[in-house]
Structures are given as structure tokens and as C-alpha cells.
Amino acid sequence: MSKRVTVLMGGFSTERAVSLNSGAAAGEALRQAGYAVTLLDVGRDVAAFIAALTQTRPDVVFNALHGRFGEDGAIQGILDIMALPYTHSGRLASAIAMDKPSAKLVFERFAIPVAPHVVADRASVLAETAMARPYVVKPLDQGSSVGVTIVTSETNDLPFSRDDWPYGRQVMVERFIPGRELTVGVMGDKALGVTEIVTDHRFYDYDAKYAQGGSRHIVPAPVAPEVFAQAQELSVLAHQALGCRGVSRADLRFDGETLYMLEVNTQPGMTDTSLVPEQALHAGISFPDLVTWLVETAQCDA
């Protein structure tokens, strides 16, 4: 009898559309692999969510949610209470990785290079007392580059100055690192490869990630062998330091001398053309095989 797998998708974060794509693609790949698949669009009604899982009682939950409440430990905590094995990282690793200041502390503890940064309220940023330009302003707990702004000497209109800016009073202010964008998928405790991301946008923002033609993925990244190896080593170390499991994706900047860890994504995109599945395929692992591995290694912290 095939395992019953419920795929969590959608949600109510700013990354809902991305999650719907990930869930649909993962669900289809799991069906191809022989699993009995149920797709569950997760909403704010927690009681309805618990009831749906209680009724179907899957053997494994495939978490294809992105953004707040899906990859920040909230859903993971509910699944732990219900004693349902689920894919990807547990609640603590998810919560730490999603909160940028907490993740930076972990990286620094393990001697993983990070850009100079500070947590500041928006008023101090607007008063130009937080950090000298150029710098990057990031919401503390959003993914997919949502709300990210690069502030240079030429920047006048600051979106986080508006009263309707929805991402909180405090922000992460980080020194802007010029250079190349690299990303490394980690599967278990092994790096899948290194990809260079090339875009005509100022940086790898939401549109560059998801709009047609917004970016190009170069696999493997055309960097020196020692840079390639170090990117993989730092990404595996970050995965382990945070306590991640399943797959994760580390994003780095390379300025020609130093690799800087930007963040680790515990719920990377899961379409067959997303970065981690793309790297897995280059390493000889098909998309159905990748999602199968995630299901077969699923855990919970009950």
C-alpha cells in the first residue's frame, strides 16, 4: 500500500502564489512516484487545518509552504503536536533561519562570514544614523526578497518610509556587498552544487526570482574551484549550525575575495525549475526522486 502524503500549499503569507506553484509541482511529482497525494490549501483557520489532517491522517506531510507561518516554525509546531512526520526542517531551525538577526548570530558563532549589519527602527534608518550608504534594508522575517531595498547615494524614495509599510517597525540594515550572487542547495548533509544567478535587476529581487526571464541560473557556477568548494562548505556548515534537515538553500555574495552568507532558506522553491531541484537534476537526482527522498526522510519532533 502506498504512503498517504498531504501536501501543504498556499498559506496566507506574501509568498502564497509561489507556494501554490511549489505544492502543485511537488504533488504531481509525488503522484508519479506512486504516492497517494492530497493537496491542502492552508488558510488562517487553524481548527479547520487540524480537522483536515485529522480526517485524512496522512503518513507524511509534505510542507510546500513559503513565508511566515509556513516556514517560521508555526506550522511545524502544530505538526509536532499532532505527531505527524513532515518534510524539511523542524520548528526551531525554521524559526531561527526565518528570523534574520537570530540566523546571523548563529552564522557568526560558527565563523561563517556575514556582512556588517544592525537591527534598527525605521526612524533611525530614515535619519541616516543606522549605517552609512550603501546598504540593504530587509524586513526581519520575510522571504523571497519581499520588502528588500538597496539604498545607495542616489536613492531618494525609500519605500519603508511610508506609514503603510507592512513589515514592522524594526528592520535589518546590512552593508551592501557588490559582486556575484551564488546559491547552494544542501540535501541532508551534502551540497548539491553551486549556481550563479545573473539578472538585469539591481539585485535578485522578487520579480527577478519569479517573473519570466527575470534571471538566469548558471549551473555549475563559473567560479574558481576553491571558491566553489568554499561555497559548498559554508552552506553545509550553515545548514548544520541552524539544525536544518531535509533540503535547504544557502544564498551568498562573492565580492571577488570573500564569500558572505546572506541567509538560509529552509523551504526552498519546489517546482522542477526551482534552484534546488535544478541543482539536484544536475547532480543526477530527478525531481520525483528528490521529493521521494524528502518524504522517506520526513520526521517530527513529537
Curated annotation (Swiss-Prot):
Signal peptide: none annotated. GO terms for biological process: cell wall organization; peptidoglycan biosynthetic process; regulation of cell shape. GO terms for molecular function: ATP binding; D-alanine-D-alanine ligase activity; metal ion binding. It comes from the Bacteria. SUPFAM superfamilies: Glutathione synthetase ATP-binding domain-like (SSF56059), PreATP-grasp domain (SSF52440). Mg(2+) 1 binds at D251, E263. ATP binds at residues 130-183. Binds 2 magnesium or manganese ions per subunit. Mg(2+) 2 binds at E263, N265. The keyword NAD does not apply. Its cofactor is Mg(2+); Mn(2+). It catalyses: 2 D-alanine + ATP = D-alanyl-D-alanine + ADP + phosphate + H(+). Pathway: Cell wall biogenesis; peptidoglycan biosynthesis. It is found in: Cytoplasm. GO terms for cellular component: cytoplasm. Its EC number is 6.3.2.4. The keyword Membrane does not apply. Pfam families: Dala_Dala_lig_C, Dala_Dala_lig_N. Residues 104-296 form the ATP-grasp domain. Transmembrane segments: none annotated. Keywords: ATP-binding, Cell shape, Cell wall biogenesis/degradation, Cytoplasm, Ligase, Magnesium, Manganese, Metal-binding, Nucleotide-binding, Peptidoglycan synthesis. Belongs to the D-alanine--D-alanine ligase family. Cell wall formation. This is D-alanine--D-alanine ligase. It comes from Rhodospirillum rubrum (strain ATCC 11170 / ATH 1.1.1 / DSM 467 / LMG 4362 / NCIMB 8255 / S1). The gene is ddl.
